[in-house]
């Protein structure tokens, strides 16, 4: 690139035009002094613009006449002096200057003929007649912009203007300008949702295994493409939203069942099955606790035999004589006493208490705390058998026998309590029979 090719432009560029001095131009050639005076003091009248005929006759008018002296010194005709030292240029010098410049010759080849009247209007009558023109004091950038705005349309046979740097006079160092690169569009990342063939830890669900294949290309005639890539990896079906894809996947999930081997109940979680099977294990018998609860009942005034109504089919305690089952061991003991009382009646007129013979054979207890008082007269006896014999012999009229079993009680409330507990399904009017009937008024 030659020295001075790039010109630093400021906001106010100096009115100096770029020109290349040719070698054949004489160094000592200078303009006459009257041209400088005409430039500093132009006349107010503006002649008509130069015609193309005058442009062709411009080389013949090489010796201009001096302007009349009357134009100088007239205050009315003198305009404001120009502050920029612009020198007038003849047509030959203008053509040599702009055609010699590589920028003007290459960029604006038709500038000398098409815009000569615009760039170089005549400033006076004398100068216009002699074919002289004055260059206005403008910068190179403003002159180029004005010439481009006011330049007439080229004729059809005219050649298009060459781009800078492509003409024959262009320097090899000037690189051709490249068109602006198109803005790269941001690559849209496609969202792919691939299924992981795993086993779900929730409720024993297991996903069917299937070969994972790359997604198939979508057909152009299948309608608009869904917003997201929601594709099932098992059957390669596309869905427009994740909810539809989730509903489709639920149909492909296999439910694992956990069945109880004893009752064949189905569970979906192995932990639920384990907690269920604990109920099938047999519980330890509670006979010891039931016996401890029934001990106070056996120490009643009169032992009552087992009731027939207490037997049930689902009982755990079975009688060895009649094959009846009882839910509690105390009920079975009372029932066995009834069998013994039916076998050993000693006195036909006196009712025997069940188990009296066995109790009589047992050695009497000499402990003072084991004395049994009579509920009628208050006499104490060392054993239960002697107490019962005393009551049977002396207080037989005050006994309350049970109507439904051979048990005998010493008071009406005791008999009522026995019937309500051991004979709930029988007729309870037996309580009313024990009450003496009042005489009618």
Swiss-Prot record:
GO molecular function, one term: RNA polymerase II cis-regulatory region sequence-specific DNA binding
A GO biological process held by the record: nervous system development
Stretches with biased composition (Basic and acidic residues): 19-28, 89-98, 292-302
Keyword set includes Zinc: yes
Start and end residues, zinc fingers (C2H2-type): 258-280, 317-339, 372-395, 400-423
Regions of compositional bias (Low complexity) in chain numbering: 138-147, 169-180
InterPro entries for the chain: INSM1/2 (IPR042972), Znf_C2H2_sf (IPR036236), Znf_C2H2_type (IPR013087)
Taxonomic placement: Eukaryota, Metazoa, Chordata, Craniata, Vertebrata
KW Secreted (keyword) present: no
Entry's localization field: Nucleus
Name of the encoding gene: insm1
Protein name (record): Insulinoma-associated protein 1
Compositional bias ranges of the Polar residues kind: 74-83
Cystine bridges: none
Primary role: May act as a transcriptional regulator. Plays a role in noradrenergic neuron, pancreatic and gastrointestinal endocrine cells differentiation during embryonic development.
Skewed-composition ranges (Basic residues): 1-12
Pfam (any one): zf-C2H2
Entry keyword set: Developmental protein, Differentiation, DNA-binding, Metal-binding, Neurogenesis, Nucleus, Repeat, Transcription, Transcription regulation, Zinc, Zinc-finger
Family affiliation: Belongs to the INSM1 family.
Source organism: Xenopus tropicalis
Region (Disordered): 1-31, 43-189, 205-224, 278-316
Region (SNAG domain): 1-20
GO cellular component: nucleus; transcription repressor complex
